[in-house]
């Protein structure tokens, strides 16, 4: 059994990231801790006027091979691995003194290889060998040794030393050990991922296969969830080790109940949809489908228009905005409807103050960022489906007019708006829109024509006029019936990928009804 509290008398410091190094070293020296170090770390400590002993002096071997061999020595690893109450005699026989604390971070392999111009030689030179070996030795022997791998750990480590007269608890040593093994796993995964993706080792800057032979993923637990998708399922939320700026995983929860699995799934759909728009926009999501989307003069205007699409489905929904949410809009929302989650890049003080009146509402702030996920994944039985993320946009210049009548300028704007919304509606997806707002949404049907009929039904239920609206379809129409249904509802223009064997029949149907139609050449299935 590990002793609960053990003193720190001797520490080895070897870091690539010098953040906080001198303050840590100074605090350890003040506690009469003997410092051992290597290379640039020893130089920095010495230049700060602090006593430090080079590892080369300890081992009797100089650093060699351009620093590739520094710490791979029994006097180092024996000092880290020696077990209290078991190995003292062996250590004494071979002149091995115990090392109680290892402070080490690794060569910056990840930050070097993320650069597009990184050469294979640069990558290889930043593969740390001695560092991971020492981390594993120290972490394995947590019964006696403490190990710190991140400058963010220094303050807590020093606080515990201060509170316990220079000693660290077994709980602290174990927690640091787990963090060290996690760091080594992350580091090795990054090396494996990079080398597995190298298509040709003969290239100076090697081409990287986007789908390498092996993938090693690292996710960090953010929180436990009340349950999974259903109450009988357990759940938790993990984020990428290096989250992409502006994506959902970077959220801050400002108030409200704990988040659920479904809250986060819906929030992601809402946030990804709303961040497509430059003008103030509101997206209301229910069961991962947008049920109302609008662009307006401000957040309040956008909300009113989005809500009007489907007030029934908006109840208990997730609301996302792409601009700072003002107090008046927050009041209008919370006085009118039950909301599960509010999302915005920021909030006026008045909006946050009013939200406290509805303490259970989860309020998320996601700082602005233009980052996009590079990949989408989906678990299947004992496997993983992986694809490049659907980050494909669409501009007016990419549209092909295929009908006798071309869309008007106003219709073109609405077509692009509806196309952006359809991208986030479950297939088969049909979106009716007019004046940069949704009129009706048909989602998740096995038949495309049924989705079109549902969109019209939703508009009718909301007492919205379809006549003069446009329609977006996430995939091609296999038959003309979808166009016929749209025409009977009053649709004037259609945007769709095209590519059906019966495109000619579909185009002819549009011409019969005087409907303008454009092809995108891009499909947006969403399952």
UniProtKB/Swiss-Prot annotation:
Residues forming the MGS-like domain are 1-149
One GO cellular component assignment for this chain's record is:
cytosol
Alphabetical list of InterPro entries matching this protein = AICAR_Tfase_dup_dom_sf, Cytidine_deaminase-like, MGS-like_dom, MGS-like_dom_sf, PurH-like
Q: Which GO terms describe its molecular function?
A: IMP cyclohydrolase activity; phosphoribosylaminoimidazolecarboxamide formyltransferase activity
Q: Which domain of life is it from?
A: Bacteria
Annotated signal sequence is none
Its catalytic activity?
(6R)-10-formyltetrahydrofolate + 5-amino-1-(5-phospho-beta-D-ribosyl)imidazole-4-carboxamide = 5-formamido-1-(5-phospho-D-ribosyl)imidazole-4-carboxamide + (6S)-5,6,7,8-tetrahydrofolate; IMP + H2O = 5-formamido-1-(5-phospho-D-ribosyl)imidazole-4-carboxamide
Q: Name one GO biological process term.
A: 'de novo' IMP biosynthetic process
Provide the E.C. number(s) assigned to this enzyme.
Answer: 2.1.2.3, 3.5.4.10
- Quick one: which pathway? Purine metabolism; IMP biosynthesis via de novo pathway; 5-formamido-1-(5-phospho-D-ribosyl)imidazole-4-carboxamide from 5-amino-1-(5-phospho-D-ribosyl)imidazole-4-carboxamide (10-formyl THF route): step 1/1; Purine metabolism; IMP biosynthesis via de novo pathway; IMP from 5-formamido-1-(5-phospho-D-ribosyl)imidazole-4-carboxamide: step 1/1
Key words of the record: Hydrolase, Multifunctional enzyme, Purine biosynthesis, Transferase
> Know anything about its domains from the record?
The IMP cyclohydrolase activity resides in the N-terminal region.
Which family does the record assign? Belongs to the PurH family.
Q: Record's NCBIfam families?
A: PRK00881.1, purH
Specify the protein name. Bifunctional purine biosynthesis protein PurH
Q: Which organism is it from?
A: Xanthomonas oryzae pv. oryzae (strain PXO99A)
């Amino acid at each position: 059994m590990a002793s609960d509290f053990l003193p720190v008398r001797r520490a080895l410091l070897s870091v690539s990231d010098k953040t906080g190094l001198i303050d840590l070293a100074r605090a350890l020296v003040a506690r009469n801790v003997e410092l051992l170090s290597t290379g640039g770390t020893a130089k920095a400590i010495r230049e700060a006027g602090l006593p430090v002993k080079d590892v080369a002096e300890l081992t009797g071997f100089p650093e060699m091979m351009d620093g590739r061999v520094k710490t791979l020595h029994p006097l180092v690893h024996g000092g880290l691995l020696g077990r209290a109450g078991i190995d003292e005699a062996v250590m004494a026989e071979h002149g091995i003194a115990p090392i109680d604390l290892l402070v080490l971070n690794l060569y910056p392999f990840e930050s070097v290889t993320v650069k597009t111009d990184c050469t294979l030689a640069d990558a290889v030179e930043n593969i740390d060998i001695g560092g991971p070996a020492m981390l594993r030795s120290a972490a394995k022997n947590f019964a006696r040794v403490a190990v710190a791998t991140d400058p963010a750990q220094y303050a807590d480590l020093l606080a515990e030393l201060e509170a316990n007269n220079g000693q660290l608890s077994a709980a602290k040593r174990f927690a640091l050990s787990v963090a060290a093994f996690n760091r080594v796993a992350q580091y090795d995964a990054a090396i494996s991922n990079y080398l597995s993706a190298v298509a040709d080792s003969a290239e100076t800057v090697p081409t990287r296969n986007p789908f390498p032979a092996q993938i090693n993923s690292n996710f960090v637990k953010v929180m436990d969830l009340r349950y999974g998708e259903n109450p009988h399922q357990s759940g938790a939320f993990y984020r990428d080790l290096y989250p992409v700026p502006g994506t959902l995983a970077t959220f801050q929860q400002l108030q409200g109940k704990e988040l659920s699995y479904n809250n986060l799934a819906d929030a992601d759909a809402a946030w990804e949809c709303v961040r497509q728009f430059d003008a103030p926009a509101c997206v209301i999501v229910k069961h991962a489908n947008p049920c109302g989307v609008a662009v307006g003069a401000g957040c309040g205007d956008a909300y009113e228009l989005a809500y009007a699409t489907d007030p029934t489905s908006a109840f208990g929904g997730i609301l996302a905005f792409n601009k700072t949410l003002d107090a008046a809009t927050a009041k209008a929302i919370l006085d009118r409807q039950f909301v599960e989650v509010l999302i915005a890049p920021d909030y006026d003080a008045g909006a946050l103050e009013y939200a406290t009146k509805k303490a259970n509402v989860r309020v998320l702030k996601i700082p602005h960022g233009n980052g996009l996920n590079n990949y989408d994944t989906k678990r299947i039985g004992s496997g993983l489906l992986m694809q490049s993320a659907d980050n494909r946009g669409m501009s007016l210049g990419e549209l092909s007019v295929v009908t006798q009548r071309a869309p008007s300028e106003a219709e073109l704007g609405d077509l692009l708006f509806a196309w952006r919304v359809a991208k986030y509606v479950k297939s088969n997806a049909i979106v009716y829109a007019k004046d940069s707002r949704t009129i009706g949404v048909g989602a998740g049907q096995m038949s495309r024509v049924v989705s079109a009929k549902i969109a019209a039904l939703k508009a009718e239920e909301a007492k919205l006029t379809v006549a003069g609206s446009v329609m977006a379809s996430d995939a091609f129409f296999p038959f003309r019936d979808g166009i016929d249904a749209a025409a009977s509802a009053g649709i004037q223009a259609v945007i769709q990928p095209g590519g059906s064997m019966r495109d000619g029949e579909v185009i002819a149907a549009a011409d019969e009804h005087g409907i303008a139609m454009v092809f995108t050449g891009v499909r947006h299935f969403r399952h």
